[in-house]
C-alpha cells in the first residue's frame, strides 16, 4: 500500500500525521526559512521538533507518503492539496514577520467613555451556520478572508454588522492584531463584537477601506468638529496611528469650532492631550474662544508641566522651571540661569576672578513648588494666569536704563530718582568728599559705588532695546524680542506690583538718617599716602558685614585668653606693666559673654575704633597684620600663648557659626512641620474636601447638611473617603506594575 517509506502505514493511521505530511510535502525544495512553531500550531499534539524530524524523513524519501486511497482526492486540479500548498507558501513563508509581532496587552489599553470597547470570542467548532465562516469563504489572494464585526450601540439601541478583509483590518486597526494574526485561528471561527457608536464605527470602516477597489466610487469620509473627538478617541484605542495624527492636526487647526460643538472633551487622555498641547503656542492657547472652559485650562496645565520638563525644548520660553527655588534672603524665585544675574541683598555680593559682581543666593529649604502653584491658583483663580505668572518668573531681560537684569514679573520695578544727585565740594566739608545726596529723598550716595546697585525713591517700567534684529527688521526672530512681545501682551497678569523691602530694597521711598543704605567712614590720614579728605579704597559699608567678619578673624582681642597673660618666662617688667595697662583700659569687655560679642561683630567694630589709642591709629587691616606676626622681641612662651589664644578664638567663632547654621536648619524644618495640620491626615483630607467645593455651593448647602448630617459623622465620612482613595491608589499601582 505504501509507495514511500515503510513507516508510512503507521502515520496514516493518525489523521494528524496525514495532515502534517500534506503540509510539509509542498515545502520540500523551498530555500526560504520555515517557521516550525507556526507549523506545530496547525496540527494539534505535535511539537516543532517532531515537525522538523518528519520533514527530514520526507526529504529523504523524495515522494508523497499519502496512501493510494487518497490519490483521487489529491489528483484533482482544484483539490484541497493544491489550495493548501498555496496557503502554506503565502502564509508560512512570505508572512513570517506577522507571527513574530509583539502582541498587544488589552488590559493596559485605556477605554474612555463608551467608545471602542471590543471583545473577541471563539465560536463552537460544531456550528455550521456561523456568519464569519460564510463570509470567510469569499477569500482574496491579498486581503485574506472577510471578518464580520458586530457593533452594539447601547445608547441608541442599535446593532449593525460590518464586513472587512482580515489583512486590511489588521493593518489599519492594529488592536485586532492580537486576535487575528495567529494562523491557528484560521481553523476556528472568530466572532468580533465592538461596543461603540454605530455612526462612528461606520466612519472608521470607510476610512479603513479608502484605498480598496470597492471604495473608489465612494466619497472619502471627512472630519468634522462634531465627530473629531469621538473619532480621535476610538482611533487611538484601535491603534490607528495615521488617523490619530490626522485628528490631532485637525484639532489644532479647528479648536475654536470644536469647543463650540456639543462634544465631551473630558474623554481625551493624557497622551492625546500632550500631543495636542505641543502643537499650540501659548499665544494660540490664549486666543482660544472657550467660553465654557472645556479645554483651554487643560492646555495651560499641560504647558505648565512642560515648563518643568528639563529635557523638553520649549519654543515659548528660553528657560525652564526645573531648577526653580526661593532665596531665603531676598525672597526671590530663581533658577540656575537667573541666580547669578538677579541681585540679592547687599551683604551677599561677591566678585569673581574677572572683576565682575556676582550674587550668591541661599536656597530656602522650606519652600515647596507644589504649594507655590496651589497658592498661585488660589490667588489668580485661573490656570491661564498661573502659567503666565510662572512664565514671567523664569524668564529675564536686561534694562537699558538701569543696566540691570530683571525678571519679567519685575517689569515695573525700575528704580530711579526724580532729581539729580548733588555732590558737596571739598571746601564746604572734608568729611563728605566723594559723597552726594539726592534732594528728592535725602538719600546719600557714593560718587564711585562699588556695589553698582541701582536704587531710587520711585519706580517705572524697564526699557529693553533690541540690538539683534534681522535684515528684514523681523523683531520677533530673536528670543529676546519674543519674550518682550509676550511680556507686553500679558503685562497685566505677569507683572507684580512693587513692594518696598527694607532688607533688599532699602533705597526706595523716603529715606531718613536712620534708614540710609551706606555708612561712610572717612579716614583723612591714611598710612598709604592719600591726600587729606580723600576716600579710603576700603570703605566700610553698613550692609557689608561679610568683610567685617573676615577682618574680625585676624584681630587679636583680650577676651580670648587662656589665663596665661603673664608667664614666668617673660623677661622684663615693661611687658607686665603694659599688659596691666591694656587690661585696665578695657575693663568692660570682660563683663559680656563671648557669645554675645561674636553675634554682633559690627557693633564691636564701632566701639573698638573709638577706644583705639593714638599709637594704634592705623587702618584695622594693617593692625591685624601686625598683631598676628611673630614678635622676635618677646619670649618663645609668649608667642606660643598668643598663637594658642588666636587658635582658640578662631575655633570659638567657627563653632558658633556652625551652631548657628545648624539651628537655622532646625528652625526651617520646624517651620515647615508647623504648616501640617494638628489633626493629622484626617483633618488635612477634610480641609481638601472643603477647598474643592465652591464657596457658593458650601454656603447654599450648609443649612441642609447641618440638620441632616451630625458632626459625629464627619470622621466616618472622611475616613471612608480616605479608604476609597487608598483603594484607588493601590488599583492604579497594580495596573502600572
Swiss-Prot record:
| Domain named BTB: residues | 147-255
Compositional bias ranges of the Acidic residues kind: 555-576
Note down the stretches annotated as region Disordered: 555-618
Biased composition (Basic and acidic residues) is annotated at 604-615
Q: Which domain of life is it from?
A: Eukaryota
Gene Ontology molecular-function annotations: identical protein binding
> Which InterPro entries does UniProt cross-reference here?
SANBR-like, SANBR_BTB, SANT/Myb, SKP1/BTB/POZ_sf
Tell me where in this chain the SANT domain is found. 21-59
UniProt record, GO biological process: isotype switching
- Pfam families noted in UniProt: BTB_SANBR (PF11822)
> How does the record comment on the protein's domains?
The BTB domain is important for homodimerization and for its function in negative regulation of class switch recombination.
> What does the UniProt record say this protein does?
Negatively regulates class switch recombination or isotype switching in splenic B-cells.
Q: How does this polypeptide assemble, per the annotation?
A: Homodimer. Interacts (via the BTB domain) with HDAC1 and NCOR2.
According to UniProt, the name of this protein is SANT and BTB domain regulator of class switch recombination
Q: Which organism is it from?
A: Rattus norvegicus
Please state the gene responsible for encoding this protein: Sanbr
Amino acid at each position: 500500500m505504501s509507495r514511500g517509506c515503510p513507516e508510512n502505514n503507521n502515520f496514516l493511521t493518525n489523521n494528524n500525521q496525514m495532515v502534517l505530511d500534506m503540509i510539509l510535502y509542498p515545502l520540500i525544495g523551498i530555500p526560504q526559512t520555515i517557521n516550525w512553531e507556526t507549523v506545530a500550531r496547525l496540527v494539534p499534539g505535535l511539537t516543532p521538533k517532531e515537525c522538523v524530524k518528519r520533514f527530514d524523513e520526507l526529504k529523504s524519501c523524495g515522494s508523497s507518503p499519502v496512501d493510494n486511497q487518497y490519490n483521487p482526492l489529491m489528483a484533482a486540479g482544484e483539490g484541497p492539496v493544491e489550495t493548501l500548498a498555496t496557503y502554506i507558501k503565502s502564509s508560512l513563508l512570505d508572512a513570517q514577520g506577522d507571527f513574530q509581532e509583539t502582541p498587544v496587552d488589552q488590559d493596559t489599553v485605556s477605554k474612555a467613555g463608551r467608545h471602542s470597547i471590543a471583545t473577541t470570542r471563539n465560536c463552537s467548532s460544531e456550528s455550521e451556520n456561523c456568519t464569519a465562516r460564510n463570509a470567510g469563504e469569499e477569500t482574496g489572494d491579498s486581503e485574506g478572508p472577510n471578518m464580520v464585526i458586530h457593533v452594539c450601540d447601547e445608547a441608541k439601541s442599535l446593532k449593525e454588522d460590518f464586513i472587512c478583509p482580515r489583512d486590511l483590518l489588521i493593518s489599519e486597526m492594529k488592536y485586532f492584531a492580537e486576535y487575528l494574526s495567529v494562523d491557528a485561528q484560521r481553523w476556528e471561527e472568530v466572532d468580533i463584537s465592538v461596543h461603540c457608536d454605530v455612526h462612528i464605527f461606520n466612519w472608521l470602516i470607510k476610512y479603513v477601506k479608502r484605498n480598496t477597489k470597492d471604495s473608489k466610487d465612494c466619497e472619502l469620509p471627512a472630519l468634522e468638529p462634531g465627530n473629531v473627538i469621538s473619532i480621535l478617541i476610538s482611533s487611538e484605542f484601535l491603534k490607528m496611528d495615521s488617523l490619530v495624527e490626522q485628528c490631532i492636526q485637525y484639532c489644532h487647526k479647528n479648536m475654536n469650532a470644536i469647543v463650540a460643538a456639543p462634544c465631551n472633551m473630558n474623554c481625551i487622555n493624557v497622551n492625546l492631550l500632550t500631543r495636542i498641547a505641543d502643537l499650540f503656542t501659548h499665544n494660540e492657547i490664549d486666543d482660544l474662544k472657550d467660553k465654557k472652559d472645556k479645554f483651554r485650562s487643560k492646555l495651560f496645565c499641560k504647558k505648565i508641566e512642560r515648563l518643568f520638563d528639563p529635557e523638553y525644548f520649549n519654543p515659548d520660553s528660553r528657560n525652564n522651571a526645573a531648577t526653580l527655588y526661593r532665596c531665603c534672603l531676598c525672597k526671590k524665585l530663581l533658577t540656575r540661569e537667573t541666580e547669578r544675574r538677579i541681585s540679592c541683598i547687599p551683604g551677599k555680593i561677591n566678585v569673581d576672578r574677572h572683576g565682575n559682581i556676582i550674587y550668591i543666593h541661599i536656597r530656602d529649604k522650606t519652600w515647596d513648588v507644589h504649594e507655590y502653584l496651589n497658592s498661585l491658583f488660589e490667588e489668580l483663580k485661573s490656570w491661564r494666569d498661573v502659567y503666565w505668572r510662572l512664565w514671567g518668573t523664569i524668564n529675564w531681560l536686561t534694562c537699558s536704563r538701569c543696566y540691570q537684569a530683571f525678571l519679567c514679573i519685575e517689569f515695573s520695578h525700575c528704580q530711579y530718582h526724580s532729581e539729580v544727585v548733588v555732590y558737596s565740594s571739598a571746601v564746604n566739608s572734608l568729611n563728605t568728599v566723594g559723597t552726594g545726596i539726592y534732594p528728592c529723598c535725602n538719600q546719600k550716595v557714593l560718587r564711585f559705588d562699588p556695589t553698582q546697585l541701582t536704587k531710587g525713591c520711585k519706580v517705572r517700567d524697564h526699557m529693553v532695546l533690541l540690538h539683534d534684529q534681522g535684515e528684514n527688521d523681523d523683531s520677533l526672530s530673536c528670543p529676546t524680542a519674543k519674550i518682550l512681545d509676550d511680556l507686553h501682551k500679558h503685562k497685566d497678569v505677569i507683572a507684580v506690583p512693587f513692594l518696598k523691602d527694607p532688607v533688599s530694597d532699602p533705597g526706595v521711598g523716603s529715606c531718613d538718617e536712620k534708614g540710609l543704605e551706606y555708612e561712610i567712614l572717612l579716614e583723612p590720614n591714611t598710612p598709604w599716602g592719600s591726600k587729606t579728605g580723600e576716600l579710603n579704597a576700603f570703605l566700610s559699608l553698613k550692609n557689608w558685614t561679610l568683610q567685617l567678619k573676615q577682618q574680625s578673624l585676624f584681630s587679636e582681642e583680650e577676651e580670648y585668653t587662656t589665663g596665661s597673660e603673664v608667664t614666668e618666662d617673660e623677661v622684663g617688667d615693661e611687658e607686665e606693666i603694659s599688659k596691666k595697662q591694656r587690661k585696665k583700659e578695657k575693663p568692660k569687655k570682660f563683663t559680656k559673654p563671648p557669645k554675645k560679642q561674636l553675634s554682633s561683630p559690627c557693633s564691636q567694630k564701632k566701639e573698638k575704633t573709638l577706644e583705639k589709642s593714638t599709637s594704634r591709629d592705623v587702618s584695622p587691616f594693617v593692625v591685624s597684620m601686625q598683631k598676628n606676626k611673630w614678635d622676635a622681641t618677646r619670649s618663645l612662651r609668649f608667642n606660643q600663648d598668643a598663637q594658642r589664644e588666636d587658635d582658640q578664638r578662631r575655633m570659638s567663632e567657627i563653632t558658633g557659626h556652625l551652631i548657628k547654621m545648624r539651628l537655622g536648619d532646625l528652625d526651617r524644618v520646624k517651620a515647615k512641620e508647623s504648616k501640617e495640620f494638628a489633626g493629622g491626615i484626617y483633618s488635612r483630607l477634610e480641609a481638601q474636601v472643603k477647598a474643592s467645593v465652591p464657596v457658593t455651593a458650601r454656603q447654599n448647602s450648609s443649612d441642609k447638611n447641618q440638620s441632616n448630617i451630625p458632626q459625629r459623622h464627619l470622621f466616618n465620612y472622611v475616613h471612608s473617603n480616605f479608604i476609597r482613595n487608598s483603594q484607588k491608589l493601590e488599583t492604579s499601582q497594580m495596573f502600572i506594575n
